[in-house]
């Protein structure tokens, strides 16, 4: 494990250019086998999982062994996975609905709770909170309720605040960060 903690050099990440390169050099591991690497990354050690700094960790609600897991989230994964999906969806929608008035109103934004915790200049919490905290500024102008209300912890209080903030808004779509919002709020 120590050689893995020395960084990506163990896998030769600098030379990985294709999927085949990656799959032949980086072994598939169970979470329990890399927990020490996750812990080191959460304590600020970099170049373990990704060449850029990892400062975000999505905290799972527990899966295989009923314990929460911390999943490293890079800026690149936010941009190229989580945000790209939304951009692709909007591109397809507008390609097929050229006269859409979607952006003449706002999107009702629902996400999990804002339970972000800072430790060693790294942060962990619900994936939806991480996504909402990192959305581009323009997303704030086309979404309701506010960032603060979107990430409130208590569902009943949050629901009242959502109604209050959106009652007079022209809501035309719904944004639901399903990775954990479904578990937290939709039962």
Regions found by a protein language model. Give the residues of each.
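Active-site phosphate/ATP/adenylate-binding loop shared across adenylate-forming ligases
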Residues: 1-182, 187
């Amino acid at each position: 494990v120590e050689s893995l903690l020395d960084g990506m050099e163990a896998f030769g990440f600098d030379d990985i250019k294709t999927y085949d390169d990656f799959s032949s050099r980086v072994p598939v591991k169970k979470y329990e086998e890399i927990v020490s690497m996750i812990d080191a990354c959460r304590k600020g050690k970099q170049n373990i999982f990704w060449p850029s700094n990892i400062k975000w960790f999505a905290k799972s609600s527990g899966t295989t062994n009923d314990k929460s897991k911390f999943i490293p989230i890079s800026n690149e994964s936010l941009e190229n996975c989580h945000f790209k999906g939304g951009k692709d969806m909007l591109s397809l929608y507008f390609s097929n609905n050229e006269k859409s008035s979607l952006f003449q109103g706002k999107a009702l934004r629902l996400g999990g709770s804002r339970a972000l915790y800072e430790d060693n200049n790294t942060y962990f919490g619900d994936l939806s909170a991480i996504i909402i905290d990192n959305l581009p500024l323009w997303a704030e102008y086309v979404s309701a309720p506010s960032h603060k209300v979107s990430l409130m912890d208590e569902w009943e209080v949050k629901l009242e605040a959502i109604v209050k903030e959106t009652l007079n808004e022209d809501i035309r779509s719904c944004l639901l960060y399903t990775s954990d919002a479904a578990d937290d709020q939709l039962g």
